[in-house]
Amino acid sequence: MLEAMAEPSPEDPPPTLKPETQPPEKRRRTIEDFNKFCSFVLAYAGYIPPSKEESDWPASGSSSPLRGESAADSDGWDSAPSDLRTIQTFVKKAKSSKRRAVQSGPTQPGPPRSTFSRLQAPDSATLLEKMKLKDSLFDLDGPKVASPLSPTSLTHTSRPPAALAPVPLSQGDLSQPRKKDRKNRKLGPGGGAGFGVLRRPRPAPGDGEKRSRIKKSKKRKLKKADRGDRLPPPGPPRAPPSDTDSEEEEEEEEEEDDEEEMTVGGGVPAPVLPTPPEAPRPPVTVHSEGAPPTDSEGKDVGSTETSQDGDASSSEGEMRVMDEDIMVESGDDSWDLITCYCRKPFAGRPMIECSLCGTWIHLSCAKIKKTNVPDFFYCQKCKELRPEARRLGGLPKSGEP
């Protein structure tokens, strides 16, 4: 047993020694790989020429055998040369970037930016072309792309004008400004005037604009004439535009007038309201004219009319009551007669005649509904003085004492 235990003892140290010897080997490989990786990245980025890098890095290989002596020495002494090499590479990079900046042009600001701008130079040109295409396709006011303040005109000054000419004269750009012009005209005078001023210097779509303006002005004049025949102009009279005003200002004033007429058109029936109550005056005056004489025929006719009409007569009576003040202005004397004991004039309100004394009393004062008018009516005085009148009911006026 002891021998068996003693046998593996000499075998134990080698596995313990192997992990001790492996870490320095791994470190040496990782540092070399790191150096190779750094050199490859710097050469690939263009900071260091590959020829110089290949000549410089073999010198570092001489330090690799030294690492076999001790791990601590290799870490302490090899770190400084590697740092120096990285610093030298960055210095070379800065010098090369300065040279490239001088060669490329004075517009590019700093050394690091110059290298990136050198790498991105073709991308910037393509971006400018894409921006130009986007402006020509998606901008509402197409010809503004060719304005002197646009970035495309500043960057592409060397290009001939023929290359930029097709952009503002495309069909989509001609149709879109007209739509925008219509929208601005509908919005108000400020937007339309400002947009018209901006669009004046453009020569190409001028003829189309003039034609559209002439057509619009003709349509507006025709509409105005039709409206003038149909409705009188409400409100105070408007002064005609002066001769010094431009065509755009005249069109804006016409649009304002049209909008005002459309807005006032909703309130036009207000002044016409007095006319409906004036229509039923003739049947009402028939009752009032029959008030002074003592004929029972007028009373019977009025009562039968109100009873037969029903709802129509009630609605007319309500309209008469509501428009009492308007109807009082008429010059008919019967409207000013005061026969009811409420001491108020006839004023077009429905009245009923007493079958005994012949006095006319308002239906509202007699507490009689317009839909239920009796054939024989007795006023309050007759009821108080002659209680037998109520019993007799249909006492004729000829039998009155």
Curated annotation (Swiss-Prot):
The keyword Chloroplast does not apply. Pfam families: PHD_2. Residues 92-101, 177-186, 212-224 have a biased composition (Basic residues). One of its GO terms (molecular function) is zinc ion binding. GO terms for biological process: autophagy; negative regulation of autophagosome assembly; negative regulation of autophagosome maturation; positive regulation of protein ubiquitination. Residues 1-30, 50-123, 139-320 are annotated as: Disordered. The PHD-type zinc-finger domain is required for interaction with LRSAM1 and negative regulation of autophagy. This is PHD finger protein 23. It comes from Mus musculus.
